[in-house]
Curated annotation (Swiss-Prot):
Gene Ontology terms: cellular component: plasma membrane; proton-transporting ATP synthase complex
Top-level lineage group: Bacteria
Protein name: ATP synthase epsilon chain
Family named by the database record: Belongs to the ATPase epsilon chain family.
Annotated Pfam families: ATP-synt_DE, ATP-synt_DE_N
Quaternary structure and partners: F-type ATPases have 2 components, CF(1) - the catalytic core - and CF(0) - the membrane proton channel. CF(1) has five subunits: alpha(3), beta(3), gamma(1), delta(1), epsilon(1). CF(0) has three main subunits: a, b and c.
InterPro entries for this protein: ATP_synth_F1_dsu/esu, ATP_synth_F1_dsu/esu_N, ATP_synth_F1_esu_C, ATPsynth_dsu/esu_N
Database matches in PANTHER family: ATP SYNTHASE DELTA/EPSILON CHAIN, ATP SYNTHASE EPSILON CHAIN, CHLOROPLASTIC
Job description of the protein: Produces ATP from ADP in the presence of a proton gradient across the membrane.
Alphabetical keyword list: ATP synthesis, Cell inner membrane, Cell membrane, CF(1), Hydrogen ion transport, Ion transport, Membrane, Transport
Gene, per the UniProt record: atpC
Length: 147
C-alpha cells in the first residue's frame, strides 16, 4: 500500500511522492516505514536512505542528520543535507575526507575538531554509499579510506 513521503531541507523540497516504503538510519539503527506505520518522530543519523517508489524501484539517498515524522499514514523527513546517490561526486567526497583528516591531525588549537569529525564522517558516508551502489567500480584507494 502506498503513502505520501516528503523529504525537505532548508533549501528545497527534495522528494514528494507516494511510496511503498522508506528505510532510514535512525539514531538507534535502521528502521523501515510502511503504510499505516505507528506515529513516530525519530532522529536520523548519517547513512543511506532507501525508498521503494510506486514503480517498485529502489531509490538511494545519502543523508546527514535530521528527523522523520510519521503520522496519519504519511511521512515527512527534514534533513540537514541529503543527496541522491547518483549525484555523489566521489572525487569531491575524497577531497573533503582528506581536508577533514588534515584538520583533525592539525596541532592548531583553533581548529574545530568536532566540525572536522562531522566533515570526515559525511565524506566517509558519501564514499561508502557510492561504492555500495556502484560495486562494479574498483576504487581500492577509496575503500582504504573507510577502514
Amino acid at each position: 500500500m502506498l503513502y505520501p513521503l516528503s523529504i525537505l531541507t532548508s533549501e528545497k523540497n527534495v522528494f514528494n511522492e507516494d511510496v511503498y516504503s522508506v528505510n532510514v538510519p535512525g539514531a538507534d539503527g535502521y528502521f523501515e516505514v510502511l503504510a499505516h506505520h505507528a506515529t513516530v518522530i525519530a532522529l536520523l543519523q548519517p547513512g543511506k536512505l532507501t525508498i521503494i517508489n510506486k514503480d517498485h524501484q529502489k531509490l538511494y539517498f545519502g543523508i546527514t542528520t535530521g528527523f522523520i515524522e510519521v503520522s496519519h499514514n504519511s511521512a515527512t523527513i527534514i534533513a540537514d543535507a541529503i543527496e541522491s546517490v547518483q549525484e555523489i561526486d566521489v572525487e569531491r567526497a575524497k577531497q573533503s575526507y582528506e581536508r577533514a583528516k588534515m584538520r583533525l591531525e592539525s596541532p592548531d588549537k583553533h581548529v574545530d575538531k568536532e566540525r572536522a569529525k562531522r566533515s570526515l564522517n559525511r565524506a566517509k558516508n558519501r564514499i561508502k554509499l557510492f561504492l555500495e551502489i556502484h560495486p562494479q567500480v574498483s576504487f581500492i584507494p577509496l575503500k582504504a579510506l573507510l577502514i
